[in-house]
């Protein structure tokens, strides 16, 4: 199975790719399965069971809300972040879930969504089960999901078949041969030397099996645009992050200090590090606040890639759009190697 660069960069919401984005995708996938099996009209009840790590940190990571939003048909890539609190409040206050945003069913949060942190699945610690019931309370359909890091989800059936994890649904690149296949960094370098190509050229050629050159560039530009907006929001946000600890945001304070500093980078080269830190803090704090971020390759690591790119844009005179695209392609492929040969799930290998 081929892991695309664009599998690694997934637009979603914070605070966690494995505990927020993955569960939301699981809920949305469950709705899709109900529809494909023509069971959707019969559904009058839903139960969600969070297990292992998803249950242990479920409240803090908004895993509970994420699954419900997925069952409402919301996608992490386009969801209206500002509307989330009202949607969740409506579910809890009215004991009603609007399935796929069109079918109201009875749903009592305290009864129909359960947390079982001590129940550990042997395959993966990030486990959830979603079940649908008819008007008589008989089970219509149930599915076990694993959220395996980076927003990727895998069903129990896929795990039994020992398939590699990927985000659902599978895309066409699985079905086509790549011109320059590689599964390790050594194999990537061998392809470069053998064919006289740069890493960017090898990776782009593989991506062009499924996407045109123009679509690749447009998608990379969009990914950077979302990252850039996340930096801007984080740099200008003040106050404390959500949660009982009342952690103070640091990005804005550092940003203002740098803007007002009498010293410039030419006088103090180490100041560049402070700028990079400010950019990374900005993204990380937006992620912690449940804002829109791009997995790179996870939400937890989402600040590094944007910070480096913004450094490149602000401090390298020769910086251009092509350089950003090249960086995203190569970095994404390196992330895919980690996913393919190890893990990007903190709960699994952190």
Describe the function of each predicted region.
Residues 1-4, 38-43:
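N-terminal glycine-rich anion-binding loops that anchor highly charged ligand groups
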Residues 2-13, 26-30:
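N-terminal signal-anchor module of multipass membrane proteins
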Residues 7-17, 51-52, 290-295, 344-349:
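Cysteine-centered functional microenvironments
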Residues 210-349:
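Accessory "access/gating" subregions that flank catalytic or transport cores
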């Amino acid at each position: 199975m081929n892991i695309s660069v664009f599998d690694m960069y997934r637009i979603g919401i914070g605070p966690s790719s494995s505990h927020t984005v993955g569960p939301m995708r699981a809920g949305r996938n469950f709705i899709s399965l109900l529809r494909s099996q023509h069971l959707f009209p019969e559904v009058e009840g839903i139960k969600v069971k969070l297990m292992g790590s998803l249950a242990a940190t479920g409240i803090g990571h908004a895993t509970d809300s994420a699954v419900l939003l997925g069952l409402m048909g919301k996608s992490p890539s386009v969801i209206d972040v500002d509307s989330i609190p009202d949607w969740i409040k409506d579910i809890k206050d009215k004991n009603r879930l609007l399935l796929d945003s069109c079918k109201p069913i009875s749903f009592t949060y305290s009864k129909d969504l359960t947390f079982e942190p001590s129940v550990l699945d042997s395959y993966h610690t990030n486990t959830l089960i979603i079940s649908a019931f008819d008007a008589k309370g008989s089970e219509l359909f149930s599915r076990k999901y694993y959220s395996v890091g980076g927003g990727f989800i895998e069903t129990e059936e896929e795990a039994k078949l020992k398939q590699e994890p990927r985000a659902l649904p599978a895309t066409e690149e699985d079905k086509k041969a790549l011109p320059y296949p590689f599964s390790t960094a050594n194999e990537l370098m061998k392809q470069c030397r053998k064919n006289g190509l740069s890493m960017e050229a090898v990776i782009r050629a593989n991506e062009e099996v499924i996407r045109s050159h123009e679509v690749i560039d447009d998608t990379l530009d969009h990914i950077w645009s979302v990252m850039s907006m996340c930096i801007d929001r984080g740099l200008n946000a003040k106050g404390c992050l959500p949660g009982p600890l009342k952690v103070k945001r640091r990005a804005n304070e550092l940003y203002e200090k740098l803007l007002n500093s009498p010293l410039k980078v030419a006088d103090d080269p180490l100041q560049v590090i402070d700028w990079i830190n400010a950019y990374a803090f900005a993204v990380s704090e937006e992620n912690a606040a449940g804002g829109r971020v791009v997995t790179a390759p996870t939400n937890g690591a989402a600040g590094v890639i944007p910070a480096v790119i913004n450094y490149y844009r602000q401090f390298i005179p020769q910086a251009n759009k092509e350089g950003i695209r090249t960086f995203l392609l190569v970095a994404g492929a390196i992330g895919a190697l980690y996913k393919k040969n190890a893990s990007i799930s903190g709960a699994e290998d952190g």
